Amino acid sequence: MSHADLARTIEAAWEDRADVTAATQGPVREAVEAALALLDSGQVRVAEKSGNADWQVNQWLKKAVLLSFRLTDMELISGAPGGAAWWDKVPSKFDGWDAERFRQAGFRAVPGAIVRRSAFIAPGAVLMPSFVNLGAHVGEGTMVDTWATVGSCAQIGKNCHISGGAGIGGVLEPLQANPVIIEDNCFIGARAEVAEGVIVGEGSVLSMGVYLGASTKIVDRATGEVVYGRVPPYSVVVSGSLPGKALPDGAPGPALYCAVIVKRVDAGTRAKTGINELLRD
């Protein structure tokens, strides 16, 4: 079945998703399973750059991921600590893998790394004890550090570092229209959070503890410009605050969180300069 045929079948099933159950067989199940296999192998991805460098979201692939939950019953999944089991609908990406299969895949997955089937991990990536949800895409040479999470259908570019405890939001809960996208060569600081379809432009640095959602004000300190939902390429971003509105009695209101672009760097500077130096004011 061609990708166009898969998309048509999945779009039609999505419109009638209330009728899709674990008992559903035939073209709908076949199309969803084929789409998940394509995602798992990296042949397709939920979002990709179009010719004008904007990101195009392949909504049919996201819908295939969502439909897969309706098509699958809960089952025991072995491998939990102490000989216990998990109870879930989505098997591990590594289920049935042997040493040769890992060699072919070309990435490292240290003990404690969890990747759900239909996520793609590119060669050269390193997964510390972390969690990568279904439909996600992790690019070549990227490290997902300890206790970091990459949400469903999130797109992580090449040579990124997702630091310890950082969270990259998914599209499943709460349901989002578009995935989070971290472009190539980005550094996401420890315990930072990027959610609600935010795009972090190539070469950007997010300091520790920066939180970005669709409604977060992103303030360029040099110009005063405020943007939402997208960090421009090669931005260095830290946490900040904006003055709040005055209270009814005239007293100063509470300051409100924002993210602040403290500087922009070119590709050469970004490549040569240590992260700590970039974050110094």
UniProtKB/Swiss-Prot annotation:
It comes from the Bacteria. GO terms for molecular function: 2,3,4,5-tetrahydropyridine-2,6-dicarboxylate N-succinyltransferase activity; nucleotidyltransferase activity. Its EC number is 2.3.1.117. Keywords: Acyltransferase, Amino-acid biosynthesis, Cytoplasm, Diaminopimelate biosynthesis, Lysine biosynthesis, Repeat, Transferase. InterPro entries: DapD_Trfase_Hexpep_rpt_fam, Hexapep, THP_succinylTrfase_dom1, THP_succinylTrfase_N_sf, Trimer_LpxA-like_sf. The keyword Cell wall biogenesis/degradation does not apply. This is 2,3,4,5-tetrahydropyridine-2,6-dicarboxylate N-succinyltransferase. One of its GO terms (cellular component) is cytoplasm. Pathway: Amino-acid biosynthesis; L-lysine biosynthesis via DAP pathway; LL-2,6-diaminopimelate from (S)-tetrahydrodipicolinate (succinylase route): step 1/3. Its main location: cytoplasm. It is found in: Cytoplasm. HAMAP family: DapD. It catalyses: (S)-2,3,4,5-tetrahydrodipicolinate + succinyl-CoA + H2O = (S)-2-succinylamino-6-oxoheptanedioate + CoA. NCBIfam families: dapD, PRK11830.1. GO terms for biological process: diaminopimelate biosynthetic process; lysine biosynthetic process via diaminopimelate. Belongs to the transferase hexapeptide repeat family. It holds the Pfam family Hexapep_2. The gene is dapD.
